[in-house]
């Protein structure tokens, strides 16, 4: 399953939502330090400060931001260090 994240920006506040179904967390993507962090299952609230999508236990994949996205643009994010369409999920399968 691939997560399609809808990314929006309001001023310095960046938020996202996921089309993934069945996640225990509501946010799929978080922004910080020029990275996109995928972590529907949660992550480390201390070890990835500023780059976590949610606190709690689980896997977080940090993806360098290599493309500019327009407001409300869709990005297919995957854990292979890219923000281009791919068949992998960066959250919980």
Swiss-Prot record:
This is HssA/B-like protein 26. It comes from the Eukaryota. It comes from Dictyostelium discoideum. It holds the Pfam family Coiled. One of its GO terms (biological process) is sorocarp development. Belongs to the hssA/B family. The lineage of its organism: Eukaryota, Amoebozoa, Evosea, Eumycetozoa, Dictyostelia.
């Amino acid at each position: 399953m691939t997560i399609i994240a809808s990314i929006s920006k309001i001023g310095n506040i960046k938020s996202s939502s996921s089309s993934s179904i069945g996640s225990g967390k509501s946010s799929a993507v978080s922004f910080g330090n020029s990275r996109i962090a995928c972590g529907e299952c949660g992550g480390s609230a201390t070890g990835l400060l500023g780059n976590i999508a949610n606190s709690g236990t689980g896997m977080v994949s940090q993806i360098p931001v290599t493309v500019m996205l327009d407001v409300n643009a869709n990005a297919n994010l995957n854990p292979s260090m890219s923000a281009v369409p791919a068949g992998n999920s960066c959250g919980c399968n």
